[in-house]
Amino acid sequence: MSQLNPKVGFVSLGCPKALVDSERILTQLRVEGYDIVPSYDAADVVVVNTCGFIDSAVTESLDAIGEAMNANGKVIVTGCLGKRPEQIREAYPQVLAVSGPQDYQSVMEAVHAALPPRHDPFVDLVPDYGIKLTPRHYAYLKISEGCNHRCSFCIIPSMRGDLVSRPVDEVLREAERLVRGGVKELLVVSQDTSAYGVDLKYAERPWRDRLYQTRMKALCEGLSELGVWTRLHYVYPYPHVDDVIGLMAEGKLLPYLDIPFQHASPRILKLMKRPGAVEKTLERVQRWKAMCPEITVRSTFIVGFPGETDAEFESLLDFLDQAQLDRVGAFAYSPVDGASANALPDQVPEEVKQERLARFMAKQAQISALRLESKIGSVQQCLVDVIEDDIAVARSRADAPEIDGLVHIQNGGELGLKVGDLVDVEITDSDEHDLFGDALPSGHAVQPGRTLNLQIV
């Protein structure tokens, strides 16, 4: 491109939903002829997409803004922390503009004001699947914004608003474009995937000569037509989640559910304003495993929530023993500015929270190690993410990127595997988190995807 093109640096922080927001902004910048550069020095202006969910994320976002201000001086701030402009401007009064999440138009207007485009837009500069910040072989597919729940520890609705679902045909067309661009795995994300379409009264829309409801199961049926891995994230434990387990058993969806249970004590769940029928939750987990023996269930939990007693924490450990979840993430409760849980009595001392977190993770590590050990001798279909020397680092159908385990393919170099290859791997060993094995010579017939060479500062 011409050296005259205006140059934008970009910092993307936060969750996969925020990453999708960044991809949309970057796509529009490229459509309008802006160059995206990987350093502050080379940038004419810097956009920082922030996170503001928990205190540590706020600190990280403010630090990133400060770094960009010190190194460049021309900074536009957007994202969740942008819902608190006074906090940003108190720390950095010289930022050019502040906007909230999903406010793409305000970001572009701020960029135009600071750095007008120097030529007419060239749509052909951008592939039809847009600019991606993930490797080319997988992509996050955001199906809605906002959330209708009011969990006491969460401030997402105040930042991103109530649930707004994207029409199902719009989502399916985006998925088609991504697959045409080389994507082998679609990761469905939202604040509440199982509530998808409720705000649109499950309206029907046409796609590929068929009507689809704007509903989780119908969306999954449509995505299954694309012939790539489809993985569900952020699934709220509603009863109708059972409807998609059959699709997993039929091989139409990856047998994987990311479903945050948060706790096992009915009283604590009530304080969290979460569903509290723990016995039903256990029954459903067992039913899912009976319907689809291959299913991987990932969940997240909060330990040390205000009022959590020793007995209630022990009940959480008992739940882990009974549920035998495959993948688990946990956090020690941390107050979030604006969350109603901050006002709850009987706050748990920090040292107790950390001790409980350590015990919780040690318990789950034992469970995970045994579940992974049971896969030794099996053959797992894997997607190659990285080539390191002679070893291919991949993920099985049970592993989402960045949050789950890896499969280390010892003979990856010998077979000439490439990033984006789908390959069958015979598992020979395991540890608490990862699997190790050898690719079967006939297992990597799928053509590899090409890694997107895009950097962000």
Curated annotation (Swiss-Prot):
Q: Which PROSITE patterns match?
A: MTTASE_N, MTTASE_RADICAL, RADICAL_SAM, TRAM
- Reaction catalysed by this chain? L-aspartate(89)-[ribosomal protein uS12]-hydrogen + (sulfur carrier)-SH + AH2 + 2 S-adenosyl-L-methionine = 3-methylsulfanyl-L-aspartate(89)-[ribosomal protein uS12]-hydrogen + (sulfur carrier)-H + 5'-deoxyadenosine + L-methionine + A + S-adenosyl-L-homocysteine + 2 H(+)
Domain of life of the organism in this record?
A: Bacteria
- The residues covered by the TRAM domain are 373-441
Question: Binding of [4Fe-4S] cluster 1: at which residues?
Answer: C15, C51, C80
Q: Which UniProt keywords apply?
A: 4Fe-4S, Cytoplasm, Iron, Iron-sulfur, Metal-binding, S-adenosyl-L-methionine, Transferase
Indicate where this protein resides in the cell: Cytoplasm
Asked if the record carries the keyword Iron-sulfur, the reply is yes
What is one cellular component GO term in this UniProt entry?
cytosol
Annotated membrane-spanning segments are none
Named cofactor requirement(s): [4Fe-4S] cluster
Q: Which residues belong to any copy of the Radical SAM core domain?
A: 133-371
SS bonds (residue pairs): none
Its job: Catalyzes the methylthiolation of an aspartic acid residue of ribosomal protein uS12.
Q: Per the similarity annotation, which family is this? A: Belongs to the methylthiotransferase family. RimO subfamily.
| The name this protein goes by in its record | Ribosomal protein uS12 methylthiotransferase RimO
